[in-house]
């Protein structure tokens, strides 16, 4: 449990918060998914890959491994991102990005698009999401391309 707290603290301490002037967009959860885009438009998979691999923004590789041969020291705490698009729909990926605790209250994965009900929030992140709605959609678009061979 102590390791989990350290990982979450590291995630929150190293990422840059989304723009403060962006309002949290409403979304609807159906089952285990958010079926509709947060922005109303599809994300950009190339931008999504850059966010996933960015150790200052998404920090995904702190916990996950994936198809990033150029990135050293990938995490082993969470499932591999390889094949994510085969395992989950875009809506399921979106809910995991927005607030994975809706599916697993004990997860160490941070809520990338939530501002309420959080603990130990760094001052720089108060009232802000970790990623913008557009960035969430970019990551979802990229992860959806990761199909099993």
Q: Language-model segments: what does each one mean?
A:
Residues 91, 95-96, 112-149:
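C-terminal capping alpha-helices of c-type cytochrome domains
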Residues 16-20:
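Sec/Tat signal peptide C-region and signal peptidase I cleavage site
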Residues 53, 86, 98-102, 141-148:
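Sec-exported extracytoplasmic/periplasmic mature domains
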Residues 1-6, 28-29:
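Domain-scale selection of a single, long terminal region
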Residues 41-42, 51, 61, 65-99, ...:
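Gly/Gly-Pro-rich "capping" loops immediately C-terminal to redox-active cysteine motifs
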Residues 55-59, 135:
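Short pre-active-site segment immediately N-terminal to redox-active cysteine/selenocysteine motifs
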Residues 22-55:
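Electrostatic cytochrome c docking/interface patches
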Residues 4-15:
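Bacterial N-terminal signal peptides
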